[in-house]
A protein has these predicted regions:
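A secondary-structure boundary/capping signal
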Residues: 4-5, 38-41, 110
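Short, hinge-like loop/turn segments at secondary-structure boundaries
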Residues: 52-56, 82-83, 124-125
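Acidic, PIN/NYN-like endoribonuclease modules and their adjacent C-terminal/linker elements
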Residues: 97, 101-125
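Short, structured coil segments at secondary-structure junctions
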Residues: 58-62, 118
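Short, well-structured N-terminal submotif of metal-dependent ribonuclease cores
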Residues: 1-36, 46-57
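Active-site neighborhoods of divalent-metal-dependent phosphate/nucleic-acid chemistry enzymes
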Residues: 64-108
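Nucleotide phosphate-binding site architecture
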Residues: 8-9, 43-46, 115, 123
Length: 125
């Protein structure tokens, strides 16, 4: 499973507040699955920290998938497909979607825009 940036932000906020919310519950429901992240999410998530070490300590609990050229080509294909249908994702979401499709793994996100991407199964939290 590939966790998108909004999931990471929600899970981090729940941990800071010491409460179980939707992201924590999702991790519990899928405790036998491996939650992975993209380098794109690392960039987006860490932008919210004055000290990148704080972000690193939190993100180190997840396995980061490599962004191979093939995943970038998938992102390009997704962009073409969505342009043809009259809509697009943002650049970061495009790369996250391309990574999920390249690896053939579900995407954990509340972003319904990902539902327009052929070949991706979105798991809402």
């Amino acid at each position: 499973m590939l966790a998108d940036t909004t999931f990471l932000i929600a899970f981090y906020a729940e941990r800071l507040a010491r409460r179980q919310g939707p992201a924590t519950a999702c991790l519990g429901r899928h405790r036998t699955d491996t939650f992975r992240i993209s380098v794109v999410s690392i960039a987006e998530f860490s932008a919210g920290f004055a000290n990148p070490l704080q972000a690193r300590v939190f993100l180190d609990m997840f396995h980061c998938l490599r962004l191979f050229p093939e995943a970038a080509y998938e992102a390009g294909a997704i962009d073409r497909e969505l342009i043809a249908s009259g809509g697009r994702l943002g650049e970061a979401d495009n790369l996250i979607a391309g990574t999920a499709r390249y690896y053939g793994i579900p995407l954990v996100s509340n972003g319904r825009a990902f539902d327009r991407v052929r070949g991706i199964r979105r798991i809402a939290y």
